[in-house]
């Protein structure tokens, strides 16, 4: 399977997710931040992978996991699904899976603009 290219919008969205959560949602370890307030640890983990454009930037589809928990769920996808059901509920998981299988045309510039704006809002909120 070809490697998914990481776009500017992915990087912005990843930062937004890790700031939003502030910790690994499985084990609770805290995200570390640099002097600019940007996250420098943990992963923004996609339940339905980045290759699924329709849910690639869906905040419900992505959560913060530390490297250990992310690796564990990558190796144990059935347990990842069960954990997501516990976290979000069966209805939300079913919605994410459904939408992940629908077609969506990409607009990289629009996604990057949106997530840059959302990231700035979230960073400003953290400073207060």
Where are these regions (language model features)?
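Short, charged surface segments at domain edges that flank catalytic/cofactor-binding sites
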Residues: 1-23, 105-106
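Glycine-centered helix-coil hinge/cap
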Residues: 85-93
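Short Cys/His-centered divalent metal-binding micro-motifs
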Residues: 29-33, 62-86
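Histidine-centered nuclease catalytic patch
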Residues: 25-62
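Conserved aromatic-histidine-acidic binding/catalytic patches
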Residues: 5, 9, 54, 72
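Short flanking/linker segments adjacent to small metal-binding domains or redox-active Cys/His motifs
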Residues: 93-128
